[in-house]
A protein has these predicted regions:
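ATP/NTP phosphate-donor binding region
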Residues: 1-25, 36-37, 70
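Catalytic core of DAGKc-family lipid kinases
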Residues: 2, 40-156
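Redox-cofactor binding/interface segments in oxidoreductases and associated redox assembly factors
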Residues: 24, 32, 156
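Short Gly/Thr/Asp-enriched flexible loops that form oxyanion-binding sites at enzyme active sites
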Residues: 30-42
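Short glycine-/acidic-enriched loop or helix-start segments at secondary-structure transitions
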Residues: 33-35, 59-60, 165-166
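Internal helical hairpin/lid segments
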Residues: 155-181
């Protein structure tokens, strides 16, 4: 089990080569760490995901069962499929890379509050940030065009749900097209 930040990345670096599948159970953050650890390995194997977090956005987008036994059965008996992996500052992601307003909420919300209140704990933590909204000077180059301005939020994602909110990125999210929304 993981106990602290980057435990899963470290454990991925320590496991021996004889495995043909890695299964993880946790939230979006745990999956992110496992993916990061896997991408740093020379030999990559499929990752099975059993969602057990607060919002499980990525699992929801993939229609992975919230029932842990059903999800575990899919990990063992399901068919592996490709999934886009993004990289930002040498950190890998499959769910989201973001900056700005509310991006620290999932990290700053106490686990005890998430255990009791679930998604509502994130909303309550987020309300603390409403009156202190910093901006960031960002330069973005995309499709040959460069935009430079002040932004309060930005994200790149491959999910139909972000922070427990569905529909933010639209319905046409494809997980293996080489593009992020």
């Amino acid at each position: 089990p993981t106990q602290k930040y980057h435990d899963a990345v470290r454990k991925m670096g320590e496991y021996e080569e004889q495995y043909d599948l890695v299964a993880c159970s946790g939230g979006d953050g745990t999956l992110d760490e496992v993916v990061t650890g896997m991408m740093k390995r020379e030999k990559k194997v499929p990752i099975g995901y059993i969602p057990a977090g607060t919002t499980n956005d990525f699992a929801s987008s993939l229609h992975i069962s919230k029932n842990m036994l059903e999800a575990a059965d899919t990990v063992v008996n399901g068919v592996p499929f490709a999934c886009d992996v993004g990289v930002f500052n040498q950190d890998y992601f499959v769910y989201i890379a973001a900056f700005g307003l509310f991006t620290d909420v999932s990290y700053e919300t106490k686990q005890s509050m998430k255990n009791v209140l679930g998604h509502l704990a994130y909303i309550l933590e987020g309300t603390k940030r409403i009156f202190n909204i910093p901006s960031y000077r960002i330069k973005v180059t995309h499709d040959g065009e460069t935009i430079e301005d002040e932004f309060i939020y930005g994200m790149v994602t491959n999910s139909r749900s972000v922070g427990g909110f569905k529909g933010i990125t639209g319905k046409n999210v494809v997980f293996d097209d080489g593009k992020f929304e």
